[in-house]
């Protein structure tokens, strides 16, 4: 189930995408939903709820601007600290920049303290603080530096008035701020008019920050912030202002592009849709969607915030600047006072010396897919240079092209032509000659000049380097060379004059050498360094302390509340032993500490009531029973009682309620009782006395004195058993209530015994600790108990119902008090029945009851027998289970009996005992009687005064189970007078019938099955990943467990899974399910587990509940696991022998299946040589062995090709692999076996041209709809059995998991790594590749034709993950519905194929039809595609999946990503699709069905484009090729041979039956393969790898040609070769020779030679394993 978890994680990743959720919304109202749709919808809903819950915990920020969903998602990702939403109610200029400014302000404020703090917002928008944070002390410095600033101020004043006059409610703080601002503006304007200094306002001022006159009150912390406000302020002025105001912490942000550090003068700010531009020492910022005035700032002052790290203020304080976050186009920085470090270094000497410090930082550079290229042109007669950012791929392509050419081929025009051709998306005759980003064409001419000059210079430079390396590498050393080397080492190789000239050139800005045309790759980062040299040191001032008296006061109040509550509880403890009082007090005090947490509703309640609870007293102890819920009332209690508060909690807080502390008399636990004299335990009583409603601990009564009458003894034992069972249940109820009152049950998050729930009824009715769901209530009784004593009593319960469904979780009609509900009180039928029986039993007639038993196997139709043989006018029917009773009632009603009579006389046994009939009956029926106690049946007979009971049951299934382990029963089984065996089953699949017969569980005749299902079982254990419960798949099927504990665990595991049900094996007896998962979770042995002492009936019941499939999940590979594993391998023909239809209706040749035919091999003679084999090949295919094709692949790869091709694009700039030579075996046989090709661009184009682009066009006018309808209808009469056609939902967890388990690890990893959602997957795009292995030709065409490689068109792995499980399920359904004489080759070996033809009698003659199709995959048209989809519809495909599948098969794009080929294909079968083999097979079946009388076929087998059909001799068969061409577009030919063949295997009669044996000519051709490559560089490696490779080939050949040692097979094959290939000699000698070389590995190695450095190597056999599909 690790796979299942991996598949589940994949779905969770899908629902993270917004588009998936949108698609789910669009399909929410669809009526054709799939199970996969429901699963994803549920996951998406849970995911959205989780996101919503997390978002609600964040600060909500409404940015108000109109934003797209993409922009809003980008903001949420950029600022995850906030819950960003937009009401889309505003539209303005530079929207993203404005929204980002709001979020940046909130983000910076979240990093600064607010309480008892003054915040200077440098250049901030004071209006924002006034409107939304008027209670915070924020002062904004908004200087008027130009007219633009004055205009912004007027905008803010207008917005203030608009906000103030909108008529909505306002806070008092805002009103005060508004009045203050209005007064300040009047004073300021008056001062400006008078020419005097303006006054200051605590909300804002119009001065620069360094001149701000605002002084807050003392005792508050001072911090500052700046949001896009430092552009016009030098860093020095900023720190001077901070120093003057005593501010030690400043956090700000500004726009920045890292490309400024690279000298770029203009660029974009993509996130805010803006740009920057450097012009004359200034930097400008502007926005593309904004027409307002832009901003211009000093560039050097701006860059100081990036480059500087230390700044010394005017009075010596040192501030350190750090860039700490980059979000979008905004960079955040911190400016903190770090003077403390400089002062800490003051020493006697160091105080006179400066402090020096050095730091560095790395600025990351985005978009490194570009390079900087110098471009040149002439302007006004001068060469002008410009450095431009260009795509790295384009520049590298040009450089690589120059490197591939010789010096004399380096021409400007050629290079320019290449750059243009690779830059323009032009298709000429289907060939595209560019791939990559498009560059402006006027840049290409400049780029070509730069690259050409660069290449010429680099080549000259490389020549000099080579010369110098050759000279320095000389082994001859002279004194002159030594002196030259020493001189160069110390003075360099460049002369002093040259170095001086280069220095002067740099000073003058003159470029020279490689500086002119170097292509610069963008760095990953820019390193910035800064240092500090400090003489003067500032002074440190302390930060004002914060008064936390309010927080301390709240903590002390909480502590005092706890102490006060504890003291009040101490006063309520009466006299008693010190130890008892202490222990009780500790328990109560601990609860008080827990409950006094004021963060919970209960804590707040106790804290508020703890003072008043001390003063409240009640006058009598009766007040505690009134249900008023007093918090801490005083009571008069005995020495064994304690007092504790009763807590009243509202229903909404029920999950947070700690355990109740209920005052009651403390009693001893059950384990303390050691004698029967205990007053708390009722002594053993007469088993015939009724059980009252009091819930007590009772002892079990003694067993009755059994009389000699067996039936009477059974009746008494049954009554005794009921009494014991009731006493045990009552004792369990008593214990649960005591555990609750003793606080042993204290955590509602944990499970309660017997699924108990506790209800308090009073002024407020509430569930304690946890509340049930509506599905968990419906109890018929509950236990009422008191708070102060041990009185417990059963009381009936009523519930509010509507249409028999419970509508609420609170019962009706209960008085005040405590109530316990549990599984034991749900029905209480046994208690009611017992009390009823003990009253009426003495008066019942003691008549003897005759027992007649219909002993039938599972699914034999016992209920149907009752329906046919019961007369409800004279008999009644009793049954054990409610479901079986309801089913019988329904069927009797359908038969015509009145509904009232059916309800009266078809009853459950419990219903009958509680409400018996007054009328007497002579006989009655009892369904599943063996599950009941014999005494129950006898009592029912006496209550009916009956003489005979007709019982239905299975003696091998689970009998009556004693639920009271403390007692032993002797008379639970009844004596059968008449027994009738039924050995037929309508339910069980044939493999289960086969298993039951094989195990001999049932005596007498073998069981016969009527089911059409053959293989239905599967196993999962450690070897397949099932190791624990977490690996159990969650599927909508029925789960069976052996134990009740396992049932509970599985139920929890499957909670919420729609359609999943769970029961024990015992509970499932008599029931039927379509799909079953049988589960064993315990590794330890148990008597019920397979192999245990009582396991047989459980095994039978567990295996016989399903009709379609059973999967056994076991953590232990026990006996049942081994049996089922072996059962999976049983052949279908063996299973069919258990079928009733096979015994009444003869299958083809079934009359011969009981005949044992002696089939012994006749060993072939050990004679022959290679010459004989070679002679046969040369005479069969003359001229093929003389052909040398060794250099064909190289010639094609290295020569020019001239092809006409259309509907494709070609990227010729893809890398081309060189032709490689490898060490290969040298075969001694010379055949036309094509060499293994090496992939290349030419091979890919050839394969595409000769295969996918050469489709037949033979189809005439066709009425597709009519042909499809008629053919499908005919197919279901000729090919399929209607009753086996399955149209249930295709997409299930089970089918997806089975498909997933078959995938390779690589494929799984690829699918898990693909995070695309369904709307992002292009199902119409396929990958294209070529197979390196060439299919051998068994004709003369290799002499004149260069065979094109086979092409593979395959989708992406994620597309296979979408369609694969569906197609796999459809194929399985199709195969299971085929008729017995129709077969599909599903990777069958020769032996498996031979089994399909076993029923054919070799003496019969047949009309054989073999059709050879050409270009089969490529011949597919819309007729084939829709025909196959129509078939898929009949087996469950529908809805959106059907549409996607049809779309993926119509117009498709195939891409060869290795060699840059892209083609466009209409229809065709994609050879790498998940349904390729199945679709090809079905197309062949339908086409031949339309052209041939398939209803007369005796035997037909299909596999892809291969088919073999046998008709009775004399059947008139017209040549179908004409209709196949004109109607089905197939280019084919009909072949007539005496010996038929299928998939390269001849159907030959050997040993009295037909066999499929592989074609020997195909093997001989393969033995001439000259390209069996061996990896290795040394002799030992070549020998080792060669031995392994030859061993694999030999093992594969022996598996496929194992019968070649039989002379009878070789003789029959010799006849087949003469019939098919027409050699002019008898092939027997060559076949005997071939058999000789296959008998041993040593003989097989004689077929090949290999030489290493002239030495022939010998090879040893290495034991290897090969795959089943590995065929050589």
Curated annotation (Swiss-Prot):
Descriptive protein name: Replicase large subunit
Alphabetized CDD domains for the sequence: Virgaviridae_RdRp (cd23251)
InterPro entries on file: (+)RNA_virus_helicase_core_dom (IPR027351), Alphavirus-like_MT_dom (IPR002588), DNA/RNA_pol_sf (IPR043502), P-loop_NTPase (IPR027417), RNA-dep_RNA_pol_alsuvir (IPR001788), RNA-dir_pol_PSvirus (IPR007094), Virgaviridae_RdRp (IPR047310), Virgavirus_MeTrfase_C (IPR013664)
Assembly mode: Heterodimer of a large and a small subunit.
Sequence similarity: Belongs to the ssRNA positive-strand viruses RNA-directed RNA polymerase family.
Chain residues that bind ATP: 856-863
Coiled-coil boundaries: 547-575
Domain Alphavirus-like MT: 85-306
Residue intervals of the RdRp catalytic domain: 1406-1519
Catalytic activity line of the entry: RNA(n) + a ribonucleoside 5'-triphosphate = RNA(n+1) + diphosphate; ATP + H2O = ADP + phosphate + H(+)
Native organism: Peanut clump virus (isolate 87/TGTA2) (PCV)
UniProt keyword list: ATP-binding, Coiled coil, Helicase, Hydrolase, Methyltransferase, Nucleotide-binding, Nucleotidyltransferase, RNA-binding, RNA-directed RNA polymerase, Transferase, Viral RNA replication
Nucleotide-binding as UniProt keyword: yes
Keyword Nucleotide-binding: yes
Domain of life: Viruses
GO-annotated molecular function: ATP binding; ATP hydrolysis activity; mRNA methyltransferase activity; RNA binding; RNA helicase activity; RNA-directed RNA polymerase activity
Region of interest called Methyltransferase, as start-end residue ranges on this chain: 64-801
GO biological process, one term: RNA processing
Additional remark text: The replicase large subunit is translated as a fusion protein by episodic readthrough of a termination codon. When readthrough of the terminator codon TGA occurs between the codons for 1145-Lys and 1147-Arg, this results in the addition of the RdRp region.
Chain segments carrying region Helicase: 853-1113
Residues annotated as domain (+)RNA virus helicase ATP-binding: 823-982
Domain (+)RNA virus helicase C-terminal: 983-1145
EC number: 2.1.1.-, 2.7.7.-, 2.7.7.48, 3.6.4.13
UniProt cross-references to Gene3D superfamilies, sorted A to Z: P-loop containing nucleotide triphosphate hydrolases
């Amino acid at each position: 189930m690790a796979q299942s978890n991996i598949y589940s994680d994949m779905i969770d990743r899908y629902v993270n995408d917004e588009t998936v959720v949108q698609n789910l919304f669009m399909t929410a109202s669809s009526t054709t939903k799939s199970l996969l749709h429901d699963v994803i919808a549920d996951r998406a809903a849970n995911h959205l709820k989780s996101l919503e819950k997390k978002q609600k915990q964040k600060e909500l920020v409404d940015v108000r601007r109109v934003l797209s969903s993409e922009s809003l998602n980008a903001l949420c990702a950029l600022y995850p600290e906030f819950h960003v939403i937009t009401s889309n109610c505003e539209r303005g200029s530079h929207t993203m920049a404005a929204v980002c400014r709001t979020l940046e302000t909130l983000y910076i404020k979240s990093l600064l303290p607010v309480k008892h703090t003054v915040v200077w917002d440098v250049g901030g928008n004071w209006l924002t603080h006034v409107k939304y944070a008027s209670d915070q002390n924020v002062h904004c410095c908004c200087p008027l530096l130009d007219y633009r600033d004055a205009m912004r101020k007027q905008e803010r004043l207008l917005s203030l008035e608009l906000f103030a006059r909108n008529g909505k409610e306002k806070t008092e703080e805002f009103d005060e701020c508004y009045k203050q601002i209005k007064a300040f503006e009047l004073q300021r304007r008056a001062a400006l008019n008078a020419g005097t200094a303006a006054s200051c306002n605590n909300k804002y001022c119009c001065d620069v920050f360094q001149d701000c006159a605002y002084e807050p009150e003392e005792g508050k912390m001072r911090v500052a912030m700046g949001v896009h406000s430092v552009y016009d302020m030098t860093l020095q002025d900023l720190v001077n202002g901070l120093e003057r105001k005593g501010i030690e912490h400043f956090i700000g942000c500004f726009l920045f592009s890292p490309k400024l550090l690279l000298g770029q003068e203009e660029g974009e700010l993509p996130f805010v849709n803006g740009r920057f531009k450097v012009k004359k020492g200034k930097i400008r910022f502007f926005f593309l969607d904004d027409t307002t005035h832009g901003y211009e700032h000093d560039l050097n002052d701006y860059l100081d915030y990036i480059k500087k790290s230390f700044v010394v203020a005017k009075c010596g304080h040192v501030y350190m600047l750090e860039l700490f976050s980059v979000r979008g186009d905004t960079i955040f920085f911190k400016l903190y006072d770090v003077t403390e470090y400089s002062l800490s270094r003051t020493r006697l000497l160091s105080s006179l010396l400066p402090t020096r410090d050095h730091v560095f930082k790395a600025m990351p550079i985005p978009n490194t897919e570009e390079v900087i290229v110098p471009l040149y042109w002439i302007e006004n007669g001068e060469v002008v240079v410009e450095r431009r950012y260009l795509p790295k791929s384009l520049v590298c392509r040009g450089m690589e092209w120059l490197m591939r050419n010789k010096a004399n081929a380096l021409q400007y025009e050629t290079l320019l032509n290449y750059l243009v051709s690779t830059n323009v998306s032009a298709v000429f005759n289907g060939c595209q000659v560019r791939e990559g980003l498009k560059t402006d064409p006027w840049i290409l001419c400049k780029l070509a000049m730069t690259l050409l000059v660069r290449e010429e210079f680099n080549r000259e430079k490389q020549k000099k380097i080579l010369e110098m390396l050759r000279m320095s590498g000389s082994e001859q050393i002279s004194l002159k060379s030594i002196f030259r080397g020493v001189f160069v080492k110390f003075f360099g190789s460049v002369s002093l004059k040259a170095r001086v000239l280069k220095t002067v050139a740099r000073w003058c800005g003159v470029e020279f050498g490689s500086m002119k045309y170097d292509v610069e790759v963008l760095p990953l980062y820019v390193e910035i360094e800064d240092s500090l040299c400090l003489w003067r040191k500032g002074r440190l001032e302390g930060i004002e302390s914060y008064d936390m008296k309010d927080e301390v006061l709240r903590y002390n109040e909480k502590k005092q509340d706890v102490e006060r509550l504890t003291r009040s509880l101490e006063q309520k403890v009466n006299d008693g032993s010190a130890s008892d009082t202490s222990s009780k007090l500790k328990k109560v005090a601990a609860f008080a500490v827990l409950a006094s947490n004021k963060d919970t509703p209960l804590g707040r309640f106790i804290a508020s009531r703890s003072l008043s609870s001390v003063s409240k007293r009640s006058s009598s102890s009766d007040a505690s029973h009134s249900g008023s819920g007093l918090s801490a009332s005083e009571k008069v209690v005995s020495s064994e009682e304690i007092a504790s508060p009763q807590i009243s909690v509202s229903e909404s807080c029920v999950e947070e309620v700690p355990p109740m502390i209920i005052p009651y008399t403390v009693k001893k636990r059950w384990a303390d009782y050691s004698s029967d004299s205990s007053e708390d335990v009722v002594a053993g009583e007469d088993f015939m006395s009724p059980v009252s409603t009091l819930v007590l601990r009772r002892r079990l009564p003694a067993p009755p004195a059994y009389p000699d009458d067996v039936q009477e003894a059974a009746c008494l034992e049954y009554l005794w058993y009921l009494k014991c069972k009731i006493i045990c249940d009552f004792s369990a109820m008593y214990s649960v209530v005591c555990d609750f009152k003793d606080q042993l049950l204290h955590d509602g998050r944990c499970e309660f015994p017997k699924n108990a729930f506790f209800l308090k009824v009073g002024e407020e009715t509430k569930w304690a600790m946890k509340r049930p769901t509506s599905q968990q209530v419906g109890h018929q009784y509950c236990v009422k108990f008191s708070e102060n004593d041990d009185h417990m009593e059963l009381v009936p319960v009523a519930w509010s119902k509507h249409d028999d469904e419970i509508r609420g979780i609170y019962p009706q009609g209960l008085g005040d008090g405590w109530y316990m509900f549990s599984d034991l009180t749900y029905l209480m039928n046994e208690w009611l029945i017992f009390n009823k029986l003990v009253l009426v039993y003495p008066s019942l007639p003691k008549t003897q009851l005759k027992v007649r038993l219909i002993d039938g196997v599972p699914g034999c139709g016992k209920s149907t027998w009752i329906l046919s043989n019961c007369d409800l006018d004279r008999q009644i029917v009793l049954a054990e289970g409610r479901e079986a009773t309801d089913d019988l009632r329904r069927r009797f009603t359908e038969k015509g009996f009145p509904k009232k009579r059916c309800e009266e006389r078809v009853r459950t046994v419990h219903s009958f005992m509680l409400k018996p009939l007054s009328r007497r009956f002579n006989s009655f029926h009892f369904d599943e009687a063996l599950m009941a106690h014999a005494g129950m049946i006898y009592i029912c007979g006496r209550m009916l005064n009956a003489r005979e009971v007709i019982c239905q049951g299975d003696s091998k299934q689970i009998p009556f189970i004693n639920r009271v382990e403390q007692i032993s029963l002797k008379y639970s089984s009844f004596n059968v007078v008449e027994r009738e065996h039924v050995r037929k089953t309508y339910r069980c699949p044939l493999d289960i019938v086969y298993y039951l017969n094989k195990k001999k569980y049932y005596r007498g005749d073998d069981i016969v099955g009527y089911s059409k299902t053959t293989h239905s079982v599967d196993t999962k254990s450690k070897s397949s990943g099932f190791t624990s419960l977490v690996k159990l798949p969650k599927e909508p099927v029925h789960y069976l467990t052996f134990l009740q504990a396992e049932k509970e665990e599985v139920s929890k595991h499957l909670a919420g899974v729609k359609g999943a049900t769970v029961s024990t094996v015992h509970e499932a007896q008599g029931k039927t399910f379509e799909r079953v998962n049988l589960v064993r979770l315990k590794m330890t042995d148990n008597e019920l587990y397979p192999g245990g002492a009582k396991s047989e009936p459980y095994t039978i019941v567990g295996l016989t509940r399903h009709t379609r499939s059973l999967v056994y999940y076991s953590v232990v590979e026990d006996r049942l696991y081994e049996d089922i594993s072996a059962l999976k391998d049983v052949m279908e023909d063996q299973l069919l022998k258990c079928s009733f239809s096979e015994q009444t209706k003869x299958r083809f040749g079934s009359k011969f299946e009981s005949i044992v035919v002696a089939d012994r091999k006749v060993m072939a003679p050990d004679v022959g040589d290679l010459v004989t084999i070679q002679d046969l090949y040369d005479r069969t295919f003359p001229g093929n062995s003389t052909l040398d094709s060794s250099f064909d692949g190289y010639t094609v790869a290295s020569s020019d090709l001239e092809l006409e091709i259309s509907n494709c694009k070609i990227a010729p700039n893809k890398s081309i692999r060189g032709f490689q030579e490898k060490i290969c075996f040298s075969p001694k046989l010379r055949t036309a076996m094509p060499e293994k090709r090496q992939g290349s661009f030419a091979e890919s184009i050839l394969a595409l041209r000769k295969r996918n682009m050469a489709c037949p066009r033979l189809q005439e006018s066709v009425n597709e709809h009519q042909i499809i309808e008629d053919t499908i209808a005919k197919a279901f009469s000729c090919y399929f059995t209607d009753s086996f056609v399955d149209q249930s939902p295709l997409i299930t967890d089970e089918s997806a998991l089975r498909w997933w388990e078959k995938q390779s690890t690589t494929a799984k990893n690829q699918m898990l790594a693909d995070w695309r959602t369904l709307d992002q997957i292009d199902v119409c795009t396929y990958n294209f590749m070529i197979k390196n292995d060439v299919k051998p030709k068994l004709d003369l065409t290799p002499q004149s034709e260069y065979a094109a490689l086979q092409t593979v068109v395959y989708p992406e792995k994620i597309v296979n993950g979408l369609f694969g499980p569906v197609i796999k399920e459809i194929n399985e359904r199709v195969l299971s519905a085929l008729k017995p004489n129709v077969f599909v080759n599903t990777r069958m070996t020769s032996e498996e194929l031979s089994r399909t033809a076993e029923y054919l009698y070799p003496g019969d003659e047949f009309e054989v039809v073999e059709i050879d199709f050409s270009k089969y995959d490529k011949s597919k048209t819309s007729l084939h595609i829709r025909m196959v989809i129509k078939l898929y519809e009949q087996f469950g495909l529908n809805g959106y999946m059907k549409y996607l599948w049809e779309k993926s098969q119509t117009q498709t794009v195939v891409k060869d990503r290795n060699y840059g080929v892209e083609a466009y294909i209409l229809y065709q079968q994609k050879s790498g699709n998940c349904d390729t083999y199945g679709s090809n097979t079905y197309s062949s079946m339908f086409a031949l069905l339309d052209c041939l009388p398939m209803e007369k076929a005796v035997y037909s087998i299909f596999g892809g484009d291969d088919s073999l059909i046998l008709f009775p001799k004399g059947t008139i068969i017209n040549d179908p090729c004409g209709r196949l061409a004109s109607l089905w577009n197939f280019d084919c030919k009909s072949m007539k041979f005496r010996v038929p063949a299928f998939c390269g295997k001849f159907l030959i009669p050997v040993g009295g039956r037909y066999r499929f044996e592989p074609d020997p000519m195909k093997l001989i051709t393969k033995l001439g393969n000259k390209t069996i490559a061996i990896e290795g560089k040394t002799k030992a490696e070549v020998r080792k790898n060669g031995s392994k490779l030859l061993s694999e080939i030999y093992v594969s050949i022996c598996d496929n040609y194992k019968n070649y040692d039989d002379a009878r097979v070789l003789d029959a094959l010799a006849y087949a070769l003469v019939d098919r290939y027409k050699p002019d000699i008898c092939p027997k000698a060559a076949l005997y020779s071939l058999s000789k070389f296959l008998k041993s590995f040593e003989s097989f190695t004689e077929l090949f030679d290999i030489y290493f450095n002239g030495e022939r190597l010998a090879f040893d056999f290495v034991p290897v394993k090969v795959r089943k599909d590995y065929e050589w």
